[in-house]
Amino acid sequence: MSRKESRVQAFQTLFQLEMKDSDLTINEAISFIKDDNPDLDFEFIHWLVSGVKDHEPVLDETISPNLKDWTIARLLKTDRIILRMATYEILHSDTPAKVVMNEAVELTKQFSDDDHYKFINGVLSNIKK
């Protein structure tokens, strides 16, 4: 399966891990999707999910200066997760930033409010510079 589908699953895993009552480990959360989606790139999903969780404070420090009149805490959970995922991938992978940004915009269109993709694109454009 494609990286796009793997990013969707990574997003959903991170969303699940952010639930207030979640005691799940990363491996447990990922194991729930393996049975239904055996063809996904689980190495990539684990890399992205664990990277975002392990580097969350640094990612937030990178994102925050690019949030005009917003704070990380005020963002929708979906937008916060997508920004963290994309920022991590831009900073720590060989995937072109343009590809990562496009995938983040598509995730935002799928999982967030209607026009938030413009906000996500703007923030990531500033981070990529």
Swiss-Prot record:
Database matches in InterPro entries: NusB-like_sf (IPR035926), NusB_fam (IPR011605), NusB_RsmB_TIM44 (IPR006027)
Molecular function in Gene Ontology: RNA binding
Entry's Gene Ontology BP terms: DNA-templated transcription termination; transcription antitermination
Keywords, in A-Z order: RNA-binding, Transcription, Transcription antitermination, Transcription regulation
Keyword DNA-binding annotated: no
Domain of life: Bacteria
Gene Ontology CC terms, in alphabetical order: cytosol
SUPFAM superfamilies: NusB-like
Function, as annotated: Involved in transcription antitermination. Required for transcription of ribosomal RNA (rRNA) genes. Binds specifically to the boxA antiterminator sequence of the ribosomal RNA (rrn) operons.
Family indicated by similarity: Belongs to the NusB family.
PANTHER family hit by this protein: ANTITERMINATION NUSB DOMAIN-CONTAINING PROTEIN, N UTILIZATION SUBSTANCE PROTEIN B-RELATED
Protein name: Transcription antitermination protein NusB
Gene symbol of the encoding locus: nusB
